[in-house]
Amino acid sequence: MALLCLCACRSTSGTDHDQIVRTSIDLAETYRSQGRPELAVEVYDRALTQADDYRLYYNKALALADQGLYTDATELCAASFERYPYVISFKKAQALFLDLAGDKDGYFDVCLEILELNPYDFDTRTELMEAYSENDMDKEAYDQALILWNQGYMLDTIHQYLEKYNPEYWENISL
């Protein structure tokens, strides 16, 4: 029944495009909140035949991930970023889904791509530093901590990573 609602909204004007997108997201998110992400994916698929919009692709990826389809969600994010290279959220979601899928190498690669796009992304660099550390990649963790420090993030947590990996140099440097 609810899927028929989307067909009635079909039009080519910008206002109608936004109405399709908003209506679709509202309906699909209702399905997701009810624990029915497979129906949300159906809503997004139908909406995408009527309105090509980055918000639909992004939310569809979330619904795929809700089903544990991390590879599909990752591939959708990668393809969507190619179409919408200004939406860095696709790369961030792709990194998250790779991490959830246990693909550490893929996760590291995508995080580095994000940092090429925005070298001052504190959250991504910190998460990457922590992931390197958890995976016994000491040099890589140290390098990320050093970049953060040099960017002006002279925080105790960053200092702890620096001191952990190069104690001779950092033990005498205080905040």
Q: What are these regions, as identified by a protein language model?
A:
Residues 18, 51-52, 85, 119, ...:
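Short coil turns that delineate tetratricopeptide repeat
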Residues 16-53, 59-62:
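Alpha-helical segment of the N-proximal tetratricopeptide repeat
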Residues 33-34, 66-67, 99-101, 134-135, ...:
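Register position in tetratricopeptide repeats
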